[in-house]
């Protein structure tokens, strides 16, 4: 909760589409990849070789890069999105079959996106609040300028009434 609000635009807001495409690519590779068994075997071998938590995190990142090297066209991405909508039951089964490391990767990516979205919302609120303060100050200046003119008019009217 100790996050700072900045009026600057988030640098990663533009990369949301890239992240979404990356996740779709990874999901697409998991569904249709013929080497799936070999990759899971590599994950198991790397997990047994790793001795510390830092090495395990590094291994997870290496496997993620291996899954995303293959370029995917926009048509394939839209087809994947349709498959996701239609086959929610299939997705649940695939999630149950994923290795723990992969689930942690997906969880971390989702948390990162959530944090990014929250920061974007906070930045927007801050910018709007800042603009509201500026408009409020401007309106105060305008009303104060009018009050001086109104006071002069009152004095003039009072002096005219006294003369009559």
Curated annotation (Swiss-Prot):
Main localization of the protein described in the UniProt heading: Golgi
Subcellular localization: Golgi apparatus, trans-Golgi network membrane; Endosome membrane
Region of interest called Disordered, as start-end residue ranges on this chain: 30-93
Coiled-coil ranges from the UniProt annotation: 73-164
Protein name per its UniProtKB record: Vacuolar protein sorting-associated protein 51
Alphabetical GO biological process terms: budding cell apical bud growth; intracellular sphingolipid homeostasis; positive regulation of macroautophagy; protein targeting to vacuole; regulation of cell size; retrograde transport, endosome to Golgi; vesicle organization
Note: Present with 319 molecules/cell in log phase SD medium.
Role: Involved in retrograde transport from early and late endosomes to late Golgi. Links the Golgi-associated retrograde protein (GARP) complex to the t-SNARE TLG1, leading to the fusion between the endosomal vesicles with the late Golgi. May also be indirectly involved in apical bud growth.
Pfam family, one: VPS51_Exo84_N
Organism, scientific name: Saccharomyces cerevisiae (strain ATCC 204508 / S288c)
Family: Belongs to the VPS51 family.
Compositionally biased spans, kind Acidic residues: 77-93
PTM-bearing positions, type N-acetylalanine: 2
Top-level taxonomy: Eukaryota, Fungi, Dikarya, Ascomycota, Saccharomycotina
Keywords: Acetylation, Coiled coil, Endosome, Golgi apparatus, Membrane, Protein transport, Transport
Transcription regulation keyword on record: no
Any single GO CC term annotated in Swiss-Prot or TrEMBL for this entry: GARP complex
UniProt membrane topology term: Peripheral membrane protein
Quaternary structure and partners: Component of the Golgi-associated retrograde protein (GARP) complex, also called VPS fifty three (VFT) complex, composed of VPS51, VPS52, VPS53 and VPS54. Interacts with the t-SNARE TLG1.
Superkingdom assignment: Eukaryota
Ranges of Basic and acidic residues composition bias in the record: 33-54, 67-76
